[in-house]
UniProtKB/Swiss-Prot annotation:
One of its GO terms (molecular function) is unfolded protein binding. This is Mitochondrial ATPase complex subunit ATP10. Pfam families: ATP-synt_10. InterPro entries: ATP10. It is found in: Mitochondrion inner membrane. It comes from the Eukaryota. GO terms for biological process: mitochondrial proton-transporting ATP synthase complex assembly. It comes from Candida glabrata (strain ATCC 2001 / BCRC 20586 / JCM 3761 / NBRC 0622 / NRRL Y-65 / CBS 138) (Yeast). Belongs to the ATP10 family. Involved in assembly of the mitochondrial F1-F0 complex. Keywords: Membrane, Mitochondrion, Mitochondrion inner membrane. The keyword Mitochondrion applies. Disulfide bonds: none annotated. One of its GO terms (cellular component) is mitochondrial inner membrane.
């Protein structure tokens, strides 16, 4: 009986070690690759349109742990996540100055374009919780997404061009939406304390379209797919009335990108007609 017990114990221990080793593998393999700046060719976005109360899943359920294929897939996902740590993001931002990719030559056609994700949050004008897609539907929207002051600053270059004296917050062809991503609970708490200060720095007429949303709503790999994972940069989406992403940019705006973005907005306005 003792022999059987010892054998069972050894088997259990070896199984636990093997199980643990599989999930430690991502940590061991987490060697980040150098970021390469490329021009966007394929549409960016999700295959399904956003809808209220949708919750994007991350990782595996408990039952999935016993599914070899799903577990292996999750291990590969974790390798990517561990490799792209905060230090990696900072180093990449410094190297690229936030220009993580180059915007496409032209806008993506409606039949090829993918969807903007579901996001919920509050605006500066109201404490009520709402869904961002509700204000996007039926309108052409230019959306700024940022999490930091530097991201806010550089993404604003696509809206306001001081050299040309252009302020497209007043553009009649579209609406401009600001999405301030709150990274974590600490930042969310700090924002609550400094909300009045934030309101004073944002013009009152923009409060309705200035959103505060928790970044965690969109899981890591989905942020990778949407190309918005680097917390230090700022991002621009042009979204059509059907909630599809038709154009995207990031980092500082060159004169060419500024003009290209607003040319896209003009073309989408003609589509509506």
């Amino acid at each position: 009986m003792r022999v059987v017990f010892q054998q069972c114990t050894k088997f259990s221990t070896s199984c636990n070690r093997a199980f643990l080793a599989r999930f430690l593998k991502p940590v061991m393999n987490a060697s980040p690759k150098e970021h390469v700046v490329k021009q966007l060719l394929k549409p960016v976005g999700l295959n399904v349109p956003p809808r209220p109360n949708i919750k994007y899943s991350e990782g595996n359920s408990w039952l999935d742990l016993f599914d070899g294929a799903k577990t292996e897939e999750r291990i590969k996902e974790l390798e990517i996540e561990f490799a792209k740590s905060g230090m990696y993001e900072m180093a990449t931002f410094r190297k690229t100055n936030g220009k993580l990719f180059l915007s496409p030559e032209s806008y993506w056609k409606a039949d090829k374009a993918l969807y903007f994700p579901h996001l919920s949050g509050r605006t500066l004008s109201s404490e009520d919780h709402g869904n961002v897609e509700d204000v996007l539907r039926g309108k052409t929207s230019v959306i700024r997404v940022f999490s930091t002051q530097v991201g806010d600053k550089i993404s604003r270059e696509y809206i306001k061009n001081t050299e040309l004296g252009i302020d497209n917050y007043e553009n009649q062809s579209c609406q401009v939406i600001d999405i301030n991503f709150l990274e974590n609970k600490l930042k969310s708490w700090l924002f609550k304390l400094s909300l009045n200060n934030l309101k004073s720095t944002v013009p009152v007429q923009r409060h309705d379209n200035y959103w505060l949303c928790h970044r965690e709503q969109i899981p890591f790999l989905m942020r990778e797919r949407l190309l918005i994972n680097n917390v230090y940069s700022g991002y621009i989406f042009v979204v059509d009335p059907n909630l599809k992403i038709r154009f995207m940019a990031c980092g500082p705006a060159s004169a060419d990108e500024f003009n290209k973005l607003w040319k896209v907005v003009g073309q989408l306005s003609k589509e509506k007609k």
